[in-house]
Amino acid sequence: MSFSDYISRIKDNIRNSIKGKAIIAVSGGQDSSLLSLLASEVLGNNLLCVFIDTGLLRKNETGRVKDFFEKHSMNYVIVDAADTFINNLKGVTDPEEKRKIIGKTFIDVLSEQAQNFGAEYLLQGTIAPDWIESGGQKRDTIKSHHNVGGLPKDMKLKLVEPLRDYYKDEIRGMSKELGLPTDIQPFPGPGLAVRIIGEVTKEKLDLLRAVTDIVERKISEAMPSESRPWQYFAVLLPVRTTGVHGDRRAYGLTVGIRMIETTDAMTGTFSKPSWDLLEDISNTITDEIPEINRVVYDITNKPPATIEWE
């Protein structure tokens, strides 16, 4: 079956499943971007695309998603809920607890938008690895996914998941077929919160946002899109180490760099970039962000590790 056939099947699924107004949360990642575009083509103004600025996003994420909505003439709203999310995460260090708090807060904000719009259906970009890792079909739960299991039992919206049988390579193939960018970096629903080990604060988010921008920029500059790792990102660690800034001792923060090669996100191997690229990334981070004085590289495959650290 071709990617064009997959697209037709998904649109038929949406057409047959939704008989009224629907809402979809768009993160800017590949899954929700693809689904929102296909659903918009089927439902028109009966679909409301909602982008929630959680304060846990990468640099320029809001502007990029707004441009996507405008380019495709989609019906959308952008909600700034950053303060709510960050306040709800105060004092929380457990990764599962973080995910659940973010999921509940997200649904609360989304439900308000759904009520205002009069939506009866919730479209969600859940794909196969999401529900498999979340304990679907009698598997043990590896970790809760933002798209899976976070919906309240008394939710009045009917859930529709047209992508749940598809894998990442198929999502990318369909995106390419539609002319969507295929080099969009996968980004977890809970955002940078699960790339900060320990408590999430605005200061840590600002640091990690700057580091993430450097990592993505340096890899984009060094490698053509077809040669880049499948996913690459930074993690802020709760580890301070001794270093030197100028002629003074410094006790700075540590970041980990993760680059992974995979086709379906179910298994993967760590990427083996050039030493020159790793050195350039490390030097740029420590030069531009004085709070950080150590950069480490993650050489763990999946399994035993998951792609994200939390």
UniProtKB/Swiss-Prot annotation:
Subunit composition and interactions: Heterodimer composed of a glutamine amidotransferase subunit (A) and a GMP-binding subunit (B).
UniProt-recorded name of the protein: GMP synthase [glutamine-hydrolyzing] subunit B
InterPro entries named among the record's database cross-references: GMP_synth_C, GMP_synthase_B, GMPS_ATP_PPase_dom, NAD/GMP_synthase, Rossmann-like_a/b/a_fold
Ligase keyword on record: yes
Gene: guaAB
Residues noted as binding ATP in the record, renumbered to the chain: 27-33
PANTHER family recorded: GMP SYNTHASE [GLUTAMINE-HYDROLYZING], GMP SYNTHASE-RELATED
Metabolic or biological pathway, per its Swiss-Prot or TrEMBL entry: Purine metabolism; GMP biosynthesis; GMP from XMP (L-Gln route): step 1/1
Organism: Thermoplasma volcanium (strain ATCC 51530 / DSM 4299 / JCM 9571 / NBRC 15438 / GSS1)
Enzyme Commission (EC) number: 6.3.5.2
Pfam family name, one: GMP_synt_C
Reaction(s) catalysed (UniProt annotation): XMP + L-glutamine + ATP + H2O = GMP + L-glutamate + AMP + diphosphate + 2 H(+)
Segments forming domain GMPS ATP-PPase: 1-187
A molecular-function term among this protein's GO annotations: GMP synthase activity
Function of the protein: Catalyzes the synthesis of GMP from XMP.
Assigned GO CC terms: cytosol
Keywords in alphabetical order: ATP-binding, GMP biosynthesis, Ligase, Nucleotide-binding, Purine biosynthesis
